[in-house]
Every structure is written in structure tokens, then in C-alpha cells.
């Protein structure tokens, strides 16, 4: 336990540490007397403080002893609680085992009761079965008598069980023949259904092919009509192209002739194979010739006007 001594003295022994000072009657005392008085007061304060410290230390030791005693009692109490808890757990375990054993005995007794009831039901069922078998035996005794008479009159059988075995064989053969007939009938019905389905599918396919053939025939006729139309247009295009080709050849020939005339007029011998370049040169020549002609006409007009003015 941590103790703040300063806080303890301040809160607990504040009143005790206050020393009542005498009223101010020392105005007539000398400084030496006052110093002695102050030392005496300090000594009294230190004695009081020492006494308080001893008292505090004694209380702290008492508190420490009390705390140790409380811890010891707490440990003893905790040990007692652990022992008591262990005792309760052991009692609970014994009680649980006893309850479990009692429950197991009740379950076992209940199972035995159920088994007894089931055995009683089985016994009752067996008794009923025995009575039923006895009744059937009494009912079928006439068949045994009949088989005995058959055995007396039939030379091929020596015992009744031979007759029964022959009957079982004939019955099994008859049942086998019935099953074969049923399987054959089912197979026949399946094959018949498959044939009908196959015939319907083929008829549908033929009908579908006929429809497709009709559509293809219609498309063929349309295609042939379009082909005739396009063939006519192609012939027209070829004829038009031939005419335009002829015209283009004539234009190129005329352009070449004009180009040659321009070259001779200009005194040039250079050759140009491209028609568009030939046309460009011809255009420039015509523009120059036109400009020269205009200049000559303007000069003639000027001369005529000057002569008229002179005559006047």
C-alpha cells in the first residue's frame, strides 16, 4: 500500500502541527533573545513532528499487520470456498450419476415393456397365422383328395409331388409363352409406331423439299428475268462505252493535231504524251493569241481615231 506522507501530514495532522505562537510581546526582546526563542520554537516543532512520525509509523505497522491478517483470512476463505465448491461438484456428480442410473433403469424397463408388448403381438400374429393356415389346409384338403384319385388312375405319375411338379412346369411354360407374346406385341407396336413416325417425317421432308423447290424455281425465274435485264443493260453499256471510246480517241487525235500545230507555230520540237498536258499548252497558246488579237484591235482603233481627228 503506497502512502503519500506529505498528503497524510497535511490532511491528518495539520491541526496538531500548528503551534500556537504567543502574542506579540517581544518588541522589547533583543535579536539574540529572539533567535533563541525561534530555535526553541523550531525544536518544539521538530519534537512534535517526530512524535507524529512515530505515531504514523506505528499506525502504518498496525495497518500492515491488519492487511496481512485480512489477506490470510481471505486466503483461508478462498480455500474454504474451493473445498466447498469441490464438495458441491462431487455431490452434483454423484447426484447426476444416480439420476442417470435411474433414467437408464427406467429406459431399460420401458424397453423391456415394449419388447414384451411386441412379443405378445408376435404371438398373437403367429396364432392368427396358424389358424389361417389350418383353415386353408381344411379348405385345400379336397384338392389333395382329388390328386390322390388322379394318382390312382394315372400310370405315368408315382407320387403327388410329380403331378404338382408337372403342373408347375406347364404353368411356367404357359407364363413364359404369355410373356414372350406380350414382348412381341410390345415390339410390334413400337416398330409400328416407328414406321408411322418415319413415314410422317419423310412425308414432311418431301413436302418441305417440294416447297423449297417451288421457292427455288420462283427465285430462278426472277434471277433469269434480272439476268436478262442486266444483260441488256450490259450490252447498252458496252455499246455506249465503245462510242465514248471512239469519241475519246477522236478528241485525243484532234488534241494531238492542235498540239503539233502549236509546236510548229512556236517553233518547238518537244513532245508531250499526256493529253491533259497537251490541252494545258493549247489553252495557254489560245489565251496568248487572244490577248495579242485584243491588243491589235485596240491599236487599230486608236490609229483610226487619231486619223479622224487629223482630218477634221
From Swiss-Prot:
Name of a matching Pfam family: DUF4200
Superkingdom, natural source: Eukaryota
Presence of the UniProt keyword DNA-binding in the record: no
Gene Ontology, cellular component aspect: cytoskeleton
InterPro entries the record matches: CFAP_domain-containing, DUF4200
UniProt keyword terms in alphabetical order: Coiled coil
Coiled coil start-end: 34-121, 172-233
Family of the protein in this entry: Belongs to the CFAP73 family.
PANTHER family: COILED-COIL DOMAIN-CONTAINING PROTEIN 42 LIKE-2-LIKE, COILED-COIL DOMAIN-CONTAINING PROTEIN 42 LIKE-2-LIKE-RELATED
Name assigned to this protein: Coiled-coil domain-containing protein 42 homolog
Amino acid at each position: 500500500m503506497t502512502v503519500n506522507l506529505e498528503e497524510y501530514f497535511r490532511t491528518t495532522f495539520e491541526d496538531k502541527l500548528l503551534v500556537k505562537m504567543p502574542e506579540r510581546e517581544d518588541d522589547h526582546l533583543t535579536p539574540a533573545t529572539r533567535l533563541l526563542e525561534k530555535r526553541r520554537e523550531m525544536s518544539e516543532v521538530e519534537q512534535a513532528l517526530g512524535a507524529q512520525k512515530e505515531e504514523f509509523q506505528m499506525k502504518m505497522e498496525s495497518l500492515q499487520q491488519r492487511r496481512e491478517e485480512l489477506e490470510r483470512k481471505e486466503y483461508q476463505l478462498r480455500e474454504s470456498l474451493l473445498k466447498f465448491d469441490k464438495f458441491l461438484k462431487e455431490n452434483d456428480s454423484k447426484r447426476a450419476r444416480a439420476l442417470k442410473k435411474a433414467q437408464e433403469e427406467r429406459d431399460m424397463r420401458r424397453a423391456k415393456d415394449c419388447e414384451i408388448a411386441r412379443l405378445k403381438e408376435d404371438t398373437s400374429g403367429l396364432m392368427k397365422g396358424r389358424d389361417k393356415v389350418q383353415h386353408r389346409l381344411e379348405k385345400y384338403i379336397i384338392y389333395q383328395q382329388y390328386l390322390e384319385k388322379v394318382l390312382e388312375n394315372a400310370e405315368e405319375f408315382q407320387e403327388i409331388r410329380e403331378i404338382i411338379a408337372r403342373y408347375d412346369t406347364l404353368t411356367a411354360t404357359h407364363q413364359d409363352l404369355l410373356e414372350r407374346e406380350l414382348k412381341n406385341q410390345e415390339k410390334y407396336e413400337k416398330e409400328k409406331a416407328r414406321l408411322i413416325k418415319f413415314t410422317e417425317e419423310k412425308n414432311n421432308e418431301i413436302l418441305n423439299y417440294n416447297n423449297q423447290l417451288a421457292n427455288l424455281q420462283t427465285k430462278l425465274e426472277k434471277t433469269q428475268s434480272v439476268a436478262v435485264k442486266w444483260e441488256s443493260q450490259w450490252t447498252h453499256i458496252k455499246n455506249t462505252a465503245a462510242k465514248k471510246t471512239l469519241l475519246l480517241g477522236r478528241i485525243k487525235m484532234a488534241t494531238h493535231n492542235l498540239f503539233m500545230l502549236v509546236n510548229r507555230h512556236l517553233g518547238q520540237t518537244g513532245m508531250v504524251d499526256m493529253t491533259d498536258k497537251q490541252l494545258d499548252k493549247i489553252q495557254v497558246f489560245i489565251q496568248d493569241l487572244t490577248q495579242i488579237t485584243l491588243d491589235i484591235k485596240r491599236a487599230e482603233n486608236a490609229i483610226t481615231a487619231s486619223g479622224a481627228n487629223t482630218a477634221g
